[in-house]
Amino acid sequence: MRTDTDQKRLMVLWGILALAFLLRVVGIGFGLPHVYHQDEPVVVNHTLAIGARGWNPHFFVLPPFSIYFLFLAYAVYFVAGKSLGIFSDASSFGTAFLSDPTAFYLIGRFFLGVAFGVLAVYWLYRVARRHFNEKTAVYSALFFSVCYLHASQSHYIYADIPLVFFLVAMFGSFLDLYEEPEPKTRIAFAVFTGLAVSAKYTAAYFLPVDFLFYLFGQKKEPFSQKLVSFLTVGIISLAVFAVVAPYTFLSWHEFYSQIHAQTGAEGFLGVVYHLRYSLANGVGWPVILLAAAGIYAMMFFYRFKARLILALCLFYYGINIFFSQPFTRYMLPLAPLLCLAAAFGWGVIGQGVGTFVRRAVLMLILLGSVLPVLYLDILFLRKDTRDVCQNWIDKNIQPGSVLVRDSAFWTPHLMQTPEQIENKYGMRGADDPAKHKRLDLMKQIAKNGTTYNLFTFSEAKDDADAGFLFQKPLLPINEAALKNINAQYLIIGYSSNEVKAWDLKDQLLAAGKLELVASFSPYRTSDKKKEQVDKFSCTAAPDDLVELFRRQRLGPYLEIFQVKS
């Protein structure tokens, strides 16, 4: 029978989980039916490609857990839709995706983002309660539920949020293994380790720390037995990874070549970069400072766990000093550990002050985290500048007009003419079964839609070996190329890297050969800046909080120019 204390504890837990859910689920429809997150199509398109070319994803930059998990979700959606008469066959399923991918992205964002995000909050509570105390568990979950970095990334389809859940479970199961070295704890730790690495390879960064702490910190087994135990864990983990990601081994050459190429995208960022940018914006200085105090205080009560958390944070952060990209999501694995340490620190510090002061300070800490998340959700609910711009184009520019854009992503996602789509069949990549089928469906949809002759500025030569298939045709960045296609309008967004396109625009504007006919700003009316403060949040919403609060909507600053004949 549950006591009043149990009932109160459950009410608090459910309240925190409800808060975590609301902060993550509100706004998950942002941009749809257009996709305004650069990385989401990577997962979604490779997921749907399984239906055309089989289980080998032919994509190994990310492990396949997210792809296979999403495929199962789509399979359930297809079966349910077919039984209800929504889909007649796989072709109609694909046509539905290309006509309006809203349902597909909502499914992905909910299950890979929201669901795994809330589950991670719950699991952190569970781990903290088992290995620390109830107060630490409550504050851990509370701090994590309002963590801007985790809440914002939980709106997206990508591998990071499942990774965080598996890392929290992996951390908890390691503590279980340390305290009770027996078969069930070894298996649990091994399974979560295998799943974590199958979500994202960076989970492996935590293994050297776990191995050394188990080998030299665990006192319940002789040294030789500890080696055998961890060898067993390694074998089971590898087996779990192989089950989830079999083509890592079956297509080893393809895997190796992609991973080797990806290493060029990561490099040295500086010692304090991720601290000042990713963690300061994503977790917040109050939580970071509380975490430091918490680790210090934890040394007096849970010395092994304090040292473990500190070592995990420092080792993971240290690797990302030298091998990382500038995006905040690379620090997501540290967020639950910092929230746990901060919760312990708050539990200790809070005992030394009065009730009023304690509640007031806690409220300020929470507001500092929750207000950015709430404002982000508000922005997610508003129209993106690309949507506003597209509405203007549909009302003011004739279908079939020749439009040139400086970016396929940072400008409105307009539909190309059937003739332009037809020309893609002869380009590199079109022979891929999934892409060929997509072209067939795109051409079918374009026949009944509002289409434009779209060109994308690029320094690459527009031949079969250049650029991405669905960005083509490409256009050299010069005035002669514009004249050659009889360009009628230029669409300039100020978030791409095509600086030469901006220079050309300035030259033509100064020469009186362009006329500005419309502009669309994401910023407040008093803010006329075209380029964003946050130079690295180029996937979806801002990560820099200054950039966030400057905005009245998401999206780039856009300008449309009419080319004078």
Enumerate the language-model features and the residues they cover.
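Short hydrophobic alpha-helices at membrane interfaces in multi-pass membrane enzymes
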Residues: M11-W14, K135-A141, S173-L195, R307-C313, ...
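Transmembrane-helix motifs of polytopic, lipid-linked glycan transferases
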Residues: W14, A18-F21, L98, T102, ...
